[in-house]
Amino acid sequence: MDERYRNDLVTAAEVGMKNAFAILNNFPVGAAVLTSRGQIYQGCNTQSVISGMGVCAERSAIDHAVACGEYVFDAIAVVSKLEVPIAPCGMCLQYIGEFSQVAGHDIHILMVGSTGNIRESSIQKMLPVIFGPLDLGIDLSRFRL
């Protein structure tokens, strides 16, 4: 991952965490994605009293970028108030994996604990086999730069 973006990406994820709507479990999570154009988009988890209606921070950040016309991501950061860095859930890994197919390359994943300790990985390491749009023969070229 390009070091010049690392701090900005983590800071954006931390801001996202502060905006989280974690009304059920008081467990705010923030995320931020870095696009191949160098833009950063943040997201946060939101919860609802209706089961299944919440949104994870990672998907929120990706959807924020998509709403702004960005589809190609190089990295994503995830932060929470726990000292131990948390990993994206399975649903978020699938979502990130599908966008790695759009990008045509691996997506770096930074997991950051509240004390600043960072665990690094990538979507290919965390979800090495993915069923995604390419398996359905979908042409993703219109979403690339």
Residue map of PLM features:
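C-terminal binding/interaction regions
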Residues: 2-22, 70-145
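Short, well-ordered amphipathic alpha-helical segments that serve as non-catalytic structural scaffolds
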Residues: 12-15, 57-65
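Short beta-strand scaffold segments in enzyme catalytic cores
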Residues: 28-35
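Alpha-helix C-terminal capping segments
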Residues: 34, 63-70
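Compact, glycine-rich, soluble single-domain proteins
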Residues: 45-56
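Short amphipathic alpha-helical face segments that pack within enzyme cores
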Residues: 56, 60, 91-94
